[in-house]
Amino acid sequence: MSPVTPIVFVVDDDISVRESLELLIRSVGWRVETFTSATDFLAHPRPTVPCCLVLDVSLPDLNGLELQQRLDDRRELPIVFITGHGDIPMSVRAMKAGATESLTKPFRDDALLNAIRSAELKTLRESYAALSRSAARR
């Protein structure tokens, strides 16, 4: 059985940011799926569950926090917020709402990759815990 390559979803309305993030994330071997808006993301069927969602706070249709609230059924999905504003109150709100990390653009590549790795580890731990609980019930 071959290992499953993690997939990261990226939601950002800026094409240059999306393309840069896609190249960076692919460079370390992860798969990437990009979305141009919250509406685009919400409308897309997702048969694959990502290890992480990299989410721009400032989107044209919904802000990142509003999108996060719409994902109530997927609270376990780790979210890394990115913002072009040095908006500390927004970062604090994002973290209180359950974000794994909040980064201000421009951020270092290794900061984003480390945030995604942390999110992936969180996803793996939660999956392992769920499997352990399931096995214990049998």
For each feature predicted by the language model, list its residue ranges.
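Active-site beta3 strand of CheY-like receiver
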Residues: 48-54, 59
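Conserved acidic segment of CheY-like receiver
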Residues: 5-17, 21-25, 53
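Short amphipathic alpha-helix used as the core "switch/output" element in two-component signaling
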Residues: 43, 65-77, 93
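The C-terminal output helix
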Residues: 117-131
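Acidic catalytic/metal-coordinating carboxylates
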Residues: 36-37, 63-66, 86
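C-terminal output helix
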Residues: 87-89, 103, 107-117
